[in-house]
């Protein structure tokens, strides 16, 4: 676990395995955070501060966390590099957690974990993100693959733990373009920390095809607690999602993906 009020990563190859938070930009101490482990109460939670900043400008970062994967009590900025978060399996934590907002402007971001406190990138982010939700948790090692309209793999990833949500952002996800999200199946590529390169993806089940209409676009039928941060990230657009502001469900309800039941 790395706890400092301000954390900036510009380069390097970093791998973190933590029973609690992976990176935590907080004014609290390690002892404070240990006392709030799994509950995110006390000094590690709620004390929003403009002094707390987590900047990722480059490098390769892999985080396997039992608590929040990336946590900032202020702003989180991701502008480059490759960031992979194998986040929590419990709904009391999130793969990403900020006090105010998460700004994504570049790089590759993959953050998998539970859905109860999943936080999305801000709607002011300049690089689009797909927020993929599953109504039931999927087993560790289940592949999630995003393909563009030409059937080319954009991201092929398999978390190391069970998960019900994945946040994916990449320079190859372009606003206004359509993308198909598959789960299951297999890949002949080479995996590092669950992220596949090269090879062919096959045998998966189509979850949904969506258009990246805004900074954050939701796919799938999973619901999100959206309780992680104080300021919260952006709310996902379209695709039959619950409208928490107005307390409304879509008229036609949710469409359950093939092979999954309510």
Can you describe what each PLM-predicted range is?
Residues 4-262:
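A composition-driven surface/loop motif
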């Amino acid at each position: 676990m790395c706890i400092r009020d301000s954390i900036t990563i510009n380069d390097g190859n970093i791998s973190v395995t933590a029973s609690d938070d992976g990176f935590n930009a907080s004014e609290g101490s390690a002892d404070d955070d240990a006392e709030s482990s799994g509950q995110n109460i006390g000094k590690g939670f709620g004390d929003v501060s403009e002094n707390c900043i987590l900047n990722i400008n480059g490098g390769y970062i892999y985080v396997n966390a039992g608590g929040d994967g990336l946590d900032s009590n202020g702003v989180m900025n991701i502008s480059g590099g490759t960031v992979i978060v194998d986040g929590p399996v419990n709904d009391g934590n999130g793969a990403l957690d900020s006090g105010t907002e998460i700004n994504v402007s570049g790089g590759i971001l993959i953050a998998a974990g539970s859905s109860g406190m999943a936080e999305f990138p801000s709607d002011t982010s300049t690089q689009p993100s797909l927020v993929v939700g599953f109504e039931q948790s999927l087993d560790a090692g289940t592949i999630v693959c995003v393909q563009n309209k030409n059937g080319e793999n954009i991201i092929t990833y398999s978390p190391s733990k069970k998960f019900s949500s994945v946040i994916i952002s990449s320079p190859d996800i372009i606003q206004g373009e359509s993308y198909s999200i598959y789960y299951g199946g297999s890949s002949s590529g080479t995996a590092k920390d669950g992220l596949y390169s090269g090879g062919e993806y096959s045998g998966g089940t189509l979850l949904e095809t969506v258009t990246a209409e805004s900074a954050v676009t939701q796919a799938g039928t999973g619901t999100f607690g959206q309780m992680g941060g104080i300021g919260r990230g952006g709310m996902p657009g379209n695709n039959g999602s619950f409208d928490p502001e107005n307390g409304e469900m879509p008229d036609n309800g949710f469409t359950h993906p093939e092979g999954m039941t309510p």
